[in-house]
UniProtKB/Swiss-Prot annotation:
MF terms (GO), sorted A to Z: guanyl-nucleotide exchange factor activity
Top-rank lineage group of the source organism: Eukaryota
Domain DH: 30-213
Species the sequence originates in: Rattus norvegicus
Assigned keywords, A-Z: Guanine-nucleotide releasing factor, Repeat, SH3 domain
Protein name: Rho guanine nucleotide exchange factor 37
Lineage: Eukaryota, Metazoa, Chordata, Craniata, Vertebrata
A GO term from the CC aspect: cytoplasm
Amino acid sequence: MADFETDEASSKSESPEQEGQGSEDKSLLHQRLAIRELIDTEVSYLHTLRLCTSDIRGHLQQLPPGDLDILFSNIDDIIQVSSRFLHGLQETACKEEKQAHLIGNLFLEFQEELEQVYKVYCANYDQALLLVKAYQKEPELQKEIQGIIEAAVPQAGPSGLSFLLVIPLQRITKYPLLLQKILENTPADASAHPVLQRATSALQDVNSNINEYKMRKEVALKYTKVEQLSLRERLARINTHTLSKKTTRLSQLLKQEAGLVPRTEDKEFDDLEERFQWVSLCVTELKSNVAAYMDNLEAFLCFRPHERNLDIPGGAAEQYCSLARDLQLQAFLQFKQRLTGLVWQPLCSLARALVGPQNLIKKRLDKLLDFERVEEKLLDVGSVTYEEEAARHTYQALNSLIVAELPQFNHLVMQWLGQILRTFVVLQRDLADQVLRRAESSMALLPHRHVSEPDFQKLLEDTLGQSSSQLRHFRESFEKVLPPSTSQPLLPGSEHQMQSLLTRYGPGKIYQVTSNINGTGTLDLTLPRGQIVALLQNKDTKGNNSRWLVDTGGHRGYVPAGKLQLYHPINPSEKEPRRQTGMPEDYWLPTPEPTQPSVPTVPTMSQVVAVYPFVARSTHELSLQAGQPVTILEAQDKKGNPEWSLVEANGQRGYVPSNFLARTPSPTPRGWNLPS
């Protein structure tokens, strides 16, 4: 009996130590079980993701184009990160004593990568669900999708696609719970405890950041949608709330412009917006230039001289026709197709991609006005309504999203733009190589084939220079003897415009469009044949004298100089009817007369004479006698004043009053000859 009592007392004295040891062993066991659960579930999770990409996504090619990208989003990036993460988890198994510590460090190491890949997937999840609901409305398609999923993942059940798509969301939210479970079974004095605490907090922050990013993307998606609404639909959306909101914003803007309230300054956003606008301008200009290039290419391909009968049998002409036909049907056609597919279509897609950020930036300015008004009220009153607080958060979310993603967007657009330009250059080089390769057999017929490239370039420049000089000489010679070109009939209702331009600029600046002009640039004008314009400058801002700056009386812009001719006066026989228009007698508008083929007419040429005598008062002026013929060099002085004209008479030049001059017709004798 005494021995039994002694043993009982001994067992009671040892029980606290045994209980402590048993509790520690139990916590360690639970910790290892939690770690095992983390690793095993990660293996199963990664296996399911790989099934989604290989056995399911690969067999859903019957879905509309682009749907697979929305459904599975960036699942490939998630698989890549999870594979490396699982490899790190499995490597910790060989060090059981430090395994919990190593797992905590591993989560901290992968914190940023996990957030980056999962936030993209979670932000696109709602759009994927909308597609799933759309498929459910098509029984045949839904049955086919369900069969593919059940064959690959039987545990998906009737949920099918929805079951698979939600798995990544469940996984990222489960990481903090698994870490918390490991942390609870880790002694507070263990070295792994603070590391696990930081890892648990970090994964909780990851989930919070993902939720915040998803909310920002939802706000952005709301304002980046481009709706094609009719005027009636737009008017139907106007209500008292809309009018009140617009009025409040306008009032806030006017107070800022008047300096009554300060304007919120955000240099970071301003710099990003300026960069974005510059990038957008580059895309717009390149698209405009490529469009003009393709129009010119189309016009070039319409001309097919090799299909004409040149009446030159055999020889170089026949070989040229064969080469031109070959290039037209193969090389040029292939170049056009590649240009459309590799340059034009990507450029159009890039231009469309700019619309969303542009709308977002515009909406951000509206929300900024709401935010500033709410901030003022918060300072004055100390509280705001629920709607005002929501408007405040909307601006903050929108601004944070733009500031975070616009730099990356600008960088991607510039990369895309550079790739398009490089592709365009490569296409040009390929076309040149292809043409040279096809023309190699014809090069033996060229007279200068043995000349070096620098010498050939100089020879070409000299030949073109001589031809240009000869053509200029011919033109000047013909202009001296040919009668003035017949002006085109005025457009209906343009008499008043003609009167206005003539009064403002004088007759020496009035030109008429000889053929239709289609403007291609932002500063180019589109004008019909017969349009009257006034010359402002005979060159553009780059000094190019083939583009003239003109005034139509309503718009100003550039037109090709070759499609303009000086507006000439008409015969005196038409002067009498013309006086009824109220114009001065010295200027006559052309009126077309019916031609009479049976009665030959004598061509007339007009000359300018001095109507009154004029005595020069300085060396800049020229003395004239009444009836003395003169040549008008400029119908205005150096300041553009049309009241004085620069003339030449008897080899001398000087200024005379413009109203002292008049044009008189002089008949040209029959049989006038061309210059020899």
